[in-house]
């Protein structure tokens, strides 16, 4: 059957809303750049043309650095591919692949928010649930020794799911039993999770001889998600796991 008008409109909204969010963010960022760049003021004091030139140069320079850091330098990527040097190729593509690594927990967090929306709940507590899930997974990842990877890695993932799930259970229970609004409760629990994680990383879970840096002990190799490339690229299987779960949620 032909797609319905409502279905087409929904698909357009799915594409349009994120695009508008990105454009709005870029515009707001550009305004902040202009308001905080001395060269722009100096240019307009000279002439309107000089000011507009300074506006373009400032925004282009800032966003050029932003996109190069997030996606890599296209020229360097092409040169690296033609050079055939494996290390140079890894270095050239590392910014883009690192962005995928960083995006992985955000994909999971977004799915958690989406599921709450589908259930009619406004879950602002995903940040705190992410903190507690990561803390639980980290503890299992470094505290358990001598386990094979086939057991240790899934166990760490399970610990993360349980940690985040239990933290999300608290506002759910409060809403069911007392009628407490999930928005208020989850916002407060976000701060509790943040402060608790900060205390743990500066105390019981702090890496020995870290020089006061709030960082956990090194996670056992058996608990780490497999990586596809050598150093300095950290790109790992978790990104494709996130995409797979996103497809399941959509389905």
Predicted regions and their residues:
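Cytosolic juxtamembrane amphipathic/interface segments immediately preceding
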Residues: 1-14, 85-93
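Helix-boundary and loop/linker segments of multi-pass membrane transporters
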Residues: 7, 87-88, 145-149, 230-233
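Short loop segments and helix-boundary regions at transmembrane helix junctions
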Residues: 8-16, 117-125, 147-211, 251
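Residue-level signature of transmembrane alpha-helical entry/exit and packing/kink sites
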Residues: 10, 14-18, 22, 94, ...
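Hydrophobic core segments of alpha-helical transmembrane domains in multi-pass membrane transport
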Residues: 17-34, 109-113, 134, 138-140, ...
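Interfacial/capping segments of alpha-helical transmembrane domains
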Residues: 28-81, 204-215
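Single transmembrane alpha-helix segments in multi-pass membrane proteins
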Residues: 33-38, 61-143, 157, 165-169, ...
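Transmembrane helix-bundle core of multi-pass membrane transporters
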Residues: 65, 74, 79-80, 186, ...
């Amino acid at each position: 059957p032909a797609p319905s008008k409502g279905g087409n409109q929904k698909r357009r909204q799915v594409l349009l809303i994120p695009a508008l969010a990105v454009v709005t963010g870029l515009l707001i960022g550009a305004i902040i750049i202009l308001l905080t760049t001395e060269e722009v003021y100096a240019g307009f004091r000279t002439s309107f043309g000089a000011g507009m030139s300074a506006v373009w140069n400032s925004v282009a320079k800032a966003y050029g650095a932003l996109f190069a850091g997030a996606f890599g330098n296209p020229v360097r990527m092409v040169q690296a591919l033609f050079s055939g040097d494996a290390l140079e190729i890894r270095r050239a593509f590392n910014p883009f692949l690192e962005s995928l690594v960083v995006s992985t927990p955000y994909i999971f967090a977004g799915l958690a928010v989406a599921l709450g929306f589908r259930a009619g709940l406004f879950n602002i507590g995903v940040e705190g649930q992410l903190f507690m899930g990561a803390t639980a997974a980290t503890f299992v990842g470094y505290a358990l020794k001598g386990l094979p990877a086939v057991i240790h890695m899934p166990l760490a993932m399970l610990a993360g799911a349980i940690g985040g799930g239990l933290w999300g259970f608290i506002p759910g229970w409060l809403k069911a039993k007392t009628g407490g609004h999930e928005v208020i409760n989850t916002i407060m629990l976000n701060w509790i999770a943040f402060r608790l994680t900060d205390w743990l990383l500066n105390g019981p879970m702090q890496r020995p001889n870290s020089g006061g840096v709030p960082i956990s002990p090194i996670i056992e190799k058996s608990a780490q998600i497999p990586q596809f490339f050598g150093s300095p690229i950290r790109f790992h299987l978790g990104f494709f796991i996130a995409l797979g779960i996103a497809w399941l949620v959509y389905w």
